């Protein structure tokens, strides 16, 4: 048992949302002093040039970023590069502040190496995040994930997303339109092409920042194809695949059905996330940047996503179960694999297994 695994057993005795708050506060405190932050970054951040790539015209020092959901309000913008991430996606943030769903709303599924959440986009609002981003001098790229305010009716969703895009687009490296969380009533209905088209068109009209859309793993293959075609048609920069799943199939943790509704992240979503990635790559090729998220735990998992078409990767649940060195281990393993397979750059490996 590693040191973190022993510590994790203790941390897992405390309620998930409470320990998240405590650990996040500790990480921010440790990475606030310049000297300590730079020392950590010097040891943990991806430095191997083989890992660097240019995506959206921006240099990413490593492909693995922190997924949306951990740092909803951009409170830890300096923290993530110091912990070895190549970038971070903050949010989901909505046009108006909202408290999210009642607690408890975050649960561990330890036998499945998974989490179940029904957070409901609890956040301080787009204006507050814009203030933080304005003050921030970036050590790494920062994406922003935007969602619909719960109180906004579906027929006003376009303006709700557009408002967030106006405020945050100029301050973000890239903008992700989240229409795939299962925890806001009716949100996933916006993935239907006839609903999605006006939202994406409006968001693109508000900003020159690269715009991506985040999709659910529970979509049918036909729906995945339609969204890929729409993204290409509208000139989107890419797709983030995938969000959490509402499926409970194959879960081993006792009592999971009694926990209530929510989205499952981590190992149980890995297979479908990979399937969706491969389908998107076959459909769109290099016309879209694909960011793969969902069930990435090891460097081998990361390698499979890269060679299946992902230019960038993300993780949240893997970080919770893997600990503070998780991102470094992924990046180190990827660098070793790239060289072993004869690649001189990460970009050359993207989609290589799909071209054989």
Curated annotation (Swiss-Prot):
<keyword id="KW-0472">Membrane</keyword>
<dbReference type="InterPro" id="IPR013785">
    <property type="entry name" value="Aldolase_TIM"/>
</dbReference>
<comment type="function">
    <text>Catalyzes the conversion of dihydroorotate to orotate with quinone as electron acceptor.</text>
</comment>
<dbReference type="GO" id="GO:0044205">
    <property type="term" value="P:'de novo' UMP biosynthetic process"/>
</dbReference>
<feature type="binding site">
    <location>
        <position position="295"/>
    </location>
    <ligand>
        <name>FMN</name>
    </ligand>
</feature>
<feature type="binding site">
    <location>
        <position position="72"/>
    </location>
    <ligand>
        <name>substrate</name>
    </ligand>
</feature>
<keyword id="KW-1003">Cell membrane</keyword>
<feature type="binding site">
    <location>
        <position position="242"/>
    </location>
    <ligand>
        <name>FMN</name>
    </ligand>
</feature>
<dbReference type="InterPro" id="IPR005719">
    <property type="entry name" value="Dihydroorotate_DH_2"/>
</dbReference>
<dbReference type="InterPro" id="IPR005720">
    <property type="entry name" value="Dihydroorotate_DH_cat"/>
</dbReference>
<dbReference type="GO" id="GO:0005737">
    <property type="term" value="C:cytoplasm"/>
</dbReference>
<feature type="binding site">
    <location>
        <begin position="68"/>
        <end position="72"/>
    </location>
    <ligand>
        <name>FMN</name>
    </ligand>
</feature>
<feature type="active site" description="Nucleophile">
    <location>
        <position position="181"/>
    </location>
</feature>
<feature type="binding site">
    <location>
        <position position="183"/>
    </location>
    <ligand>
        <name>substrate</name>
    </ligand>
</feature>
<dbReference type="InterPro" id="IPR050074">
    <property type="entry name" value="DHO_dehydrogenase"/>
</dbReference>
<keyword id="KW-0560">Oxidoreductase</keyword>
<keyword id="KW-0665">Pyrimidine biosynthesis</keyword>
<dbReference type="GO" id="GO:0006207">
    <property type="term" value="P:'de novo' pyrimidine nucleobase biosynthetic process"/>
</dbReference>
<protein>
    <recommendedName>
        <fullName>Dihydroorotate dehydrogenase (quinone)</fullName>
        <ecNumber>1.3.5.2</ecNumber>
    </recommendedName>
</protein>
<keyword id="KW-0285">Flavoprotein</keyword>
<keyword id="KW-0288">FMN</keyword>
<feature type="binding site">
    <location>
        <begin position="243"/>
        <end position="244"/>
    </location>
    <ligand>
        <name>substrate</name>
    </ligand>
</feature>
<feature type="binding site">
    <location>
        <position position="92"/>
    </location>
    <ligand>
        <name>FMN</name>
    </ligand>
</feature>
<comment type="pathway">
    <text>Pyrimidine metabolism; UMP biosynthesis via de novo pathway; orotate from (S)-dihydroorotate (quinone route): step 1/1.</text>
</comment>
<feature type="binding site">
    <location>
        <position position="178"/>
    </location>
    <ligand>
        <name>substrate</name>
    </ligand>
</feature>
<dbReference type="InterPro" id="IPR001295">
    <property type="entry name" value="Dihydroorotate_DH_CS"/>
</dbReference>
<dbReference type="GO" id="GO:0005886">
    <property type="term" value="C:plasma membrane"/>
</dbReference>
<feature type="binding site">
    <location>
        <begin position="117"/>
        <end position="121"/>
    </location>
    <ligand>
        <name>substrate</name>
    </ligand>
</feature>
<feature type="binding site">
    <location>
        <position position="145"/>
    </location>
    <ligand>
        <name>FMN</name>
    </ligand>
</feature>
<dbReference type="GO" id="GO:0106430">
    <property type="term" value="F:dihydroorotate dehydrogenase (quinone) activity"/>
</dbReference>
<comment type="similarity">
    <text>Belongs to the dihydroorotate dehydrogenase family. Type 2 subfamily.</text>
</comment>
<feature type="binding site">
    <location>
        <begin position="316"/>
        <end position="317"/>
    </location>
    <ligand>
        <name>FMN</name>
    </ligand>
</feature>
<feature type="binding site">
    <location>
        <position position="178"/>
    </location>
    <ligand>
        <name>FMN</name>
    </ligand>
</feature>
<feature type="binding site">
    <location>
        <position position="266"/>
    </location>
    <ligand>
        <name>FMN</name>
    </ligand>
</feature>
<feature type="binding site">
    <location>
        <position position="214"/>
    </location>
    <ligand>
        <name>FMN</name>
    </ligand>
</feature>
<comment type="subunit">
    <text>Monomer.</text>
</comment>
<dbReference type="Pfam" id="PF01180">
    <property type="entry name" value="DHO_dh"/>
</dbReference>
């Amino acid at each position: 048992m590693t040191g973190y695994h022993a510590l994790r057993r203790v941390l897992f005795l405390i309620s998930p949302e409470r320990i998240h708050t405590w650990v996040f506060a500790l990480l921010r405190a440790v990475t606030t002093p310049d000297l300590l932050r730079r020392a950590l970054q010097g040891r943990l951040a991806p430095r191997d040039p083989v890992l660097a790539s240019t995506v959206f015209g921006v240099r990413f020092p490593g492909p693995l970023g922190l997924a949306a959901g951990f740092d909803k309000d951009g409170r830890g913008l300096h923290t993530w590069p110091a912990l070895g991430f190549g970038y971070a996606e903050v949010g989901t943030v909505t046009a108006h502040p909202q408290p999210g769903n009642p607690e408890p709303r975050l649960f561990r599924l330890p036998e499945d190496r998974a989490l179940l959440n029904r957070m409901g986009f609890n956040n301080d609002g787009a204006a507050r995040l814009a203030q933080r981003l304005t003050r921030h001098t970036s050590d790494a790229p920062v994406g922003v994930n935007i969602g619909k305010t719960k109180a906004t009716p579906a027929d006003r969703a376009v303006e709700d997303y557009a408002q967030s895009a106006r405020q945050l687009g100029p301050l973000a490296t890239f903008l992700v339109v989240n229409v795939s969380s299962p925890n806001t009533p009716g949100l996933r209905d916006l993935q239907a092409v006839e609903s999605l088209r006006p939202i994406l068109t409006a968001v693109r009209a508000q900003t020159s920042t690269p715009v991506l859309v985040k999709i659910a793993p529970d979509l049918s293959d036909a729906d995945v194809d339609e969204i890929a075609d729409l993204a290409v048609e509208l000139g989107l920069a890419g797709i983030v695949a995938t969000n959490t799943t509402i499926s409970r199939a194959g879960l081993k943790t006792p009592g999971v059905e009694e926990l209530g509704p929510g989205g499952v992240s981590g190992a149980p979503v890995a297979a479908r996330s990979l399937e969706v990635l491969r389908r998107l790559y076959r459909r769109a090729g290099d016309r879209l940047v694909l960011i793969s998220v969902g069930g990435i735990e090891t460097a081998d998992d990361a390698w499979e996503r890269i060679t299946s078409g992902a230019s960038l990767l993300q993780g949240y649940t893997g970080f919770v179960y893997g600990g503070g060195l998780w991102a470094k281990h992924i990046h180190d393993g990827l660098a070793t694999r790239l060289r072993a397979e004869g690649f001189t750059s990460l970009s050359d490996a993207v989609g290589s297994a799909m071209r054989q």
